[in-house]
């Protein structure tokens, strides 16, 4: 009995030692399994922003030309200042035009007098014709003279109206509200009616247009994606953001007005026109800008953080994922474009895949890893085409 007890005690001790070793081995194995941060992919939608070059264009342009000839006797504006519709810009010497008006009024008075006398003569001839005291020819002559006299009155009235208009044209006014440019004439200059050179240009800059160019390929691709339902367009006016030449974002949001149905044969592009508020005059005509046109939202898109995408020696994009058994796998993917700090992946991955985004230096394909949730699961989505 004692002998059995002596043999049992060492056996129990050895068993306990083996159990302790197994537990310690399991702990060491768990401790050696690297932890990696993963993002579980789920389909979503992204805003599609087309980045297009363009230039600013005045909303309205008025090239001021004289409609009557004469000598400029006064300039009534300061170059570069705002002028309102109807404001006087130049004064042409009105004296010759006033004389023409006076002459036209005199001609009208003479025509009215002649017409009055012709009417009296015609009425007399008409009365005498009934009693056969005058011939039919004398009556017809009197009627013709009356018609001619009345026609001369009409011509004289038109001459007075034209002379009055010409006198008004001596005061050269702005047809629009805008900013005046550099004057091409000074006081004392002789100008002619409807001359080729403008006196000054007035431009309305608030609001202001931005003319954008888009390649025909991109234009057609966008139409196809909208028609197929891949892109859901914005309802109502299409919003447009603007980046200035210095890299800063313009503070005002514009809207897309229309797209030109004609393709430029030399550039193979179409023109889009956007309109922007310009209350502070920050946008000037001819400025080069870059516009971000909100085309809509692309549906069922997979976004992968940039930390989870690498490129191999052949330049192809790859990603490491954890499969259902927590084994690291290498996937070759198609990463079409970057959106902020994420890639749009069009092939190689699917919804539900766990993409490794941190701890990459501690793993390689084929080994096991322990997943921890990453803080990058949710991110804003804006896609630039």
Swiss-Prot record:
GO terms for biological process: bile acid and bile salt transport; response to antibiotic; response to toxic substance. The lineage of its organism: Bacteria, Pseudomonadati, Pseudomonadota, Gammaproteobacteria, Enterobacterales. It comes from Escherichia coli O157:H7. A lipid is attached at residue 21 (S-diacylglycerol cysteine). The gene is mdtE. Residues 1-20 form the signal peptide. It is found in: Cell inner membrane. SUPFAM superfamilies: HlyD-like secretion proteins. Homotrimer. Part of the tripartite efflux system MdtEF-TolC, which is composed of an inner membrane transporter, MdtF, a membrane fusion protein, MdtE, and an outer membrane component, TolC. The complex forms a large protein conduit and can translocate molecules across both the inner and outer membranes. It holds the Pfam family CusB_dom_1. A lipid is attached at residue 21 (N-palmitoyl cysteine). It comes from the Bacteria. This is Multidrug resistance protein MdtE.
